[in-house]
Every structure is written in structure tokens, then in C-alpha cells.
């Protein structure tokens, strides 16, 4: 038994790591902080990467955050749901954390994981086109706000 969060997808990843290690493929292990975490309740809670507090401990005053209220998201309005997306980044640097709460927010963790693990800059994500209406747009809009180009920010 490996200590840490007992998540099926974490165990699956660790199993692949062991198999590749045995095969001599020299795999690298994903840091636990970069493994997506989702609590399937109502509303759902999803997170990957550093919290704002963890980022401030590492990067100090260089940390930038944005909270995007899902009230500004068309699909969330259609679904009559609410919640927030929070992105944590380093000024002039990558996004280091994604956090969200709201109905179906666990479905957004994939893009959040890509942003964090690929060290995407807010401007990189802001330049991507997100389908409308989709809750996924909220990640793009949060990145736009973090990049200094807010579109529909409702705080």
C-alpha cells in the first residue's frame, strides 16, 4: 500500500509506473500534487496543483489568482447552477493550480490538469477557443482574466 490519497486513477498511474520500471523504460512518477482530485458530491469539488497558500509559500508575492464566478457562464446559467473556478499562477509564469466547485465541475479537471502539468501560461490558455455554451468556457475565461484580458468576469 502506497501512502497518500487512495484514488483509483492514482493507483492506475502507479501500476503503469511499476510495469514500465520493470520493463526498463525509465518512467517518471507524477508528483501527488499534480494528480487530479475530485469529490463527487453536490456541488462537485475539483482540484489539481497548488493551492494559493502553497503557491505563496513557494513563490511569495509573485502569485496571481483569479476567481471566475460560474454565474457568468452560459451553460451554467442554462443548468441553473452556480460555483467558481479559481486559477493560481506565478506572475509572468505558468498556471500552478486549478480549483473549482459547482455542478459537473469534475468534468473540467482534465483541462485543469493539462494547464498545471504542461505549465501553461494564462495567455496560452486564453488564446484557445472554448465551445459555447459549455461549462468548459469558464476555464478559458478565467485564463483570459488572469492574462489581463477579461471577457465576462462577474465577481
Show the residue positions of the predicted features:
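Rossmann-like dinucleotide/flavin-binding elements
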Residues: 1-33, 93, 134
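Short beta-strand and adjoining strand-loop segment in the mid-core
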Residues: 1-7, 38-45
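Flexible, glycine-rich terminal cap/loop adjacent to redox cofactors
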Residues: 23-24, 28, 40-51, 56-155
Amino acid at each position: 500500500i502506497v501512502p497518500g490519497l487512495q484514488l483509483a486513477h492514482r493507483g492506475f498511474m502507479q501500476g503503469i509506473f511499476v510495469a514500465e520500471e520493470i520493463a526498463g523504460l525509465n518512467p517518471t512518477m507524477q508528483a501527488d500534487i499534480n494528480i487530479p482530485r475530485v469529490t463527487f458530491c453536490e456541488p462537485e469539488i475539483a482540484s489539481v496543483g497548488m493551492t494559493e497558500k502553497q503557491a505563496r509559500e513557494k513563490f511569495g508575492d509573485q502569485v496571481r489568482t483569479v476567481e471566475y464566478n460560474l454565474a457568468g457562464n452560459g451553460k451554467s446559467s442554462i443548468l441553473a447552477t452556480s460555483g467558481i473556478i479559481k486559477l493560481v499562477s506565478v506572475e509572468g509564469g505558468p498556471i500552478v493550480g486549478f480549483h473549482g466547485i459547482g455542478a459537473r465541475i469534475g468534468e473540467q479537471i482534465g483541462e485543469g490538469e493539462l494547464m498545471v502539468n504542461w505549465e501553461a501560461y494564462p495567455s496560452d490558455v486564453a488564446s484557445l477557443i472554448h465551445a459555447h455554451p459549455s461549462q468548459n468556457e469558464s476555464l478559458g475565461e478565467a485564463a483570459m482574466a488572469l492574462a489581463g484580458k477579461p471577457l465576462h468576469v462577474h465577481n
